[in-house]
Amino acid sequence: MKHIRNFSIIAHIDHGKSTLSDRLIQVCGGLSDREMDAQVLDSMDLERERGITIKAQSVTLEYKAKNGETYQLNFIDTPGHVDFSYEVSRSLAACEGALLVVDAGQGVEAQTLANCYTALDMNLDVVPILNKIDLPQADPERVAAEIEDIVGIDAMNAVRCSAKTGVGIDEVLEVIVDQIPPPEGDPEAPLQALIIDSWFDSYLGVVSLVRIKNGVLKKGDKFKVMSTGQNHTADRVGIFTPKQTDKTELKTGEVGFVIAGIKEIHGAPVGDTLTLAKHGAEKPLPGFKKVKPQVYAGVFPISTDEYENFRDALNKLSLNDASLFFEPESSSALGFGFRIGYLGLLHMEIIQERLEREYDLDLITTAPTVVYEVLLTSGETIYVDNPADLPAINNIEEMREPIVEANILVPKEYLGNVITLCIEKRGTQVNMVYHGNQVAVTYHLPMAEVVMDFFDRLKSTSRGYASLEYNFIRFDPADMVRLDILINGDRVDALAMIIHRSNIRHRGLALVEKMKELIPRQMFDIAIQAAVGSQIIARSTVKALRKDVTAKCYGGDVSRKKKLLNKQKEGKKRMKQVGNVEVPQEAFLAVLKLNE
């Protein structure tokens, strides 16, 4: 056991995490040079295209150290993006140490900091590593000082390496062996294994990635999942070298996979504990905190007969992504679909792309909303994540919106732009600290403003240098109202949105104008109105198409023309009473695009 090292790598996006892991695999001979592929661990197409890591992966490597001993290194890859911080805390729970990789040109960024604090809270040993020293703009001295100043760990003797050229990789491996402690645990105790991740394989059923904390799991053992109490037999156990390699047993401290032919999707929830069916452990391991979705959106299949496939796809996806939440929803305009909860907008985009790619679905998404806390006049408090569920205005005592604490790291010269942006988004400044050339600003911002387009705007006002990390802190009373869109006097539920009272005029007008362009003309006038409660704040009319009924009159009396025109008017009036308007799909998409 003292030759096992479990570690993960924490880094900001693009600081070279995945490349460094490729090098470690290559040096330790996990794959032959022919199979070596850039970003081996980012196995999803989407991860490669966007160049980000989304899912945690694991690899077991053998390393012969300079002291002549052979060590087993279990390396768990983690994502760096703020929306996937949950995946990170999960990976860290299985480790004893973490490598903090910092780009020697860019320096410390907000996410690095957030994930690093998560690691320190879990009592992991954090080892700093300066990467990309081959770049001309690399300044390892400055960055080392920055790490000490901002993060507060000693970085003067930090290993300097370049994952791209392979310089300093051996030193990295030595540091892992020297500075990261071996796992603790009792091989004789009853089995306790933590499920770090699980995914669905159409041939094998559920595959779970586990970290053995105590005891041993052998092939053929009967084990039980502690939260569900169900028993299964371990058909195969093994490790990833990144290839799946079968073994006869997983010992204490090791990280590997278990396949038990579990067919039903929620058979092995992530964060759960496995133990043996006979002499099992008394209590489960402390898992992870369940994440609450921050953003909700209704997602509907474009053709209604895809509803079943859509449900299956969501079930399979939620196994692999523990933070996904969904419940069925129906809309009079869009038919049947699901209300899905996400951790943030990037998460939402990724999930939607994965559904469209991996499961071949055509989907339409309504505007994203956050969760509001609503105090009713009856004294009870409810949580609303769908604008259509908001009670009538006269039943609401107080609306409270979620507030996030946003930590922004930005170079001095862009500070002004960032502050202007935060004020525009109704933020209040809490703190500001200068660290050398960087400034750390803390703001309290309404989450609704953050999820819309804050991140993109932040990047563009700071030329991409600012970095953001945010978490939910509390609900604050706010003057929020529901903006409804009425078409010929009927509310269209899928177009409703909850916004701040100061924005309603501007938003209502823009929406109504946009809808006017998109709704095709009918044989009668269509009134498009934006309303708050019973008060109409904006209106426009799609004019009717009409036939020229007076064309056949040559001269003659005006009363003849009047008669024909009045007859046409009567007809249009009757038509309007029975006619109903189809709202085209583009109109729903337009509402989303309006924020841009």
Swiss-Prot record:
GO terms for cellular component: plasma membrane. CDD domains: EF4_II, EF4_III, LepA, lepA_C. It is a peripheral membrane protein. It is an enzyme of class 3 (hydrolase). The keyword Cell inner membrane applies. One of its GO terms (biological process) is positive regulation of translation. GTP binds at D14, H15, G16, K17, S18, T19, N131, K132, I133, D134. Its main location: membrane. It is found in: Cell inner membrane. Keywords: Cell inner membrane, Cell membrane, GTP-binding, Hydrolase, Membrane, Nucleotide-binding, Protein biosynthesis. The keyword Transferase does not apply. Pfam families: EFG_C, GTP_EFTU, GTP_EFTU_D2, LepA_C. Its EC number is 3.6.5.n1. Residues 2-184 form the tr-type G domain. It catalyses: GTP + H2O = GDP + phosphate + H(+). One of its GO terms (molecular function) is guanosine tetraphosphate binding. InterPro entries: EF-4, EFG_III/V, EFG_V-like, EFTu-like_2, G_TR_CS, LepA_C_sf, LepA_CTD, LepA_IV. Belongs to the TRAFAC class translation factor GTPase superfamily. Classic translation factor GTPase family. LepA subfamily. Required for accurate and efficient protein synthesis under certain stress conditions. May act as a fidelity factor of the translation reaction, by catalyzing a one-codon backward translocation of tRNAs on improperly translocated ribosomes. Back-translocation proceeds from a post-translocation (POST) complex to a pre-translocation (PRE) complex, thus giving elongation factor G a second chance to translocate the tRNAs correctly. Binds to ribosomes in a GTP-dependent manner. PANTHER family: TRANSLATION FACTOR GUF1 HOMOLOG, CHLOROPLASTIC, TRANSLATION FACTOR GUF1-RELATED. This is Elongation factor 4. It comes from Shewanella sp. (strain ANA-3). The gene is lepA.
